[in-house]
């Protein structure tokens, strides 16, 4: 058997047991040894089959403690709405000019927001934005006339989530540098949002497993009951 890297050998904590959420957070932070501020990600296994239309799980949650990320926002809007987006802090605002930049390969953004009247134009970017999960969608508030608020939400802690083929939702919920309490609040907010997004077609146990990990560290299981304690 190949020898494990020293980084893995140094990991501590029981990775098989389900821990109270506060304990899991402490273990994840204790095992984050990278020289950069690692992101912390939650993974939630849901009792759904995304192949069925009535078992899709998708939405957006505003994390109370923020994400710790510098989210770059591109907005498709014109005139007064373009000015509103710029005033709210959007890095890239435009219409046909922004479209042409993206067609030419420009992708220096993490979120795309559009006013409803811009969607005929933005829709033509489906093959570029869609596979990257960047296509604006009214269900998650990224197609809206209220572009200023949408930009503020994106920069202030709004996280989009969508169930993957295996029935798992992955999402960043902060950084190792966050306090334990800040991470705990974000974990609870994320799980609460997933419960509220439970689709009509879901049968049996809905939240089946919750895990927490850092960018370079091990994952730890969370006792589901402790999230709502």
UniProtKB/Swiss-Prot annotation:
InterPro entries in UniProt: Ribosom_uL1_bac-type, Ribosomal_uL1, Ribosomal_uL1-like, Ribosomal_uL1/biogenesis, Ribosomal_uL1_3-a/b-sand, Ribosomal_uL1_CS
Gene of this entry: rplA
Lineage: Bacteria, Pseudomonadati, Pseudomonadota, Alphaproteobacteria, Caulobacterales
HAMAP family reported for this sequence: Ribosomal_uL1_B
Subunit structure, interactors included: Part of the 50S ribosomal subunit.
Pfam families the record matches: Ribosomal_L1
GO MF, any single term: tRNA binding
UniProt name for this protein: Large ribosomal subunit protein uL1
Family: Belongs to the universal ribosomal protein uL1 family.
Protein's organism: Caulobacter sp. (strain K31)
């Amino acid at each position: 058997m190949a020898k494990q890297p020293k980084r893995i050998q140094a990991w501590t904590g029981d990775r098989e047991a389900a821990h109270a959420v506060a304990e899991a957070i402490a273990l994840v932070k204790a095992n984050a040894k990278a020289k950069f501020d690692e992101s912390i990600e939650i993974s939630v296994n849901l009792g759904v089959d995304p192949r069925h239309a009535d078992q899709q799980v998708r939405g957006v949650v505003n994390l109370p403690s923020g994400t710790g990320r510098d989210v770059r926002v591109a907005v498709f809007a014109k005139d007064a709405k373009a000015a509103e987006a710029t005033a709210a802090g959007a890095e890239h605002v435009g219409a046909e000019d922004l479209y042409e930049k993206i067609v030419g390969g420009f992708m220096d953004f993490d979120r795309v927001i559009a006013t409803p009247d811009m969607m005929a134009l933005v829709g033509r970017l489906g093959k570029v934005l869609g596979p990257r999960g960047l296509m604006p969608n009214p269900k998650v508030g990224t197609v809206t006339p209220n572009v200023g608020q949408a930009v503020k939400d994106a920069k202030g802690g709004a996280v989009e989530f969508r169930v993957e083929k295996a029935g798992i939702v992955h999402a960043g919920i902060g950084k190792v540098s966050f306090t334990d309490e800040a991470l705990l609040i974000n974990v609870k907010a994320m799980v609460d949002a997933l419960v509220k997004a439970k689709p009509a077609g879901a049968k049996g146990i809905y939240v089946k497993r919750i895990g927490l990990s850092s960018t370079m560290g091990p994952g730890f299981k969370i006792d589901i009951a402790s999230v709502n304690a």
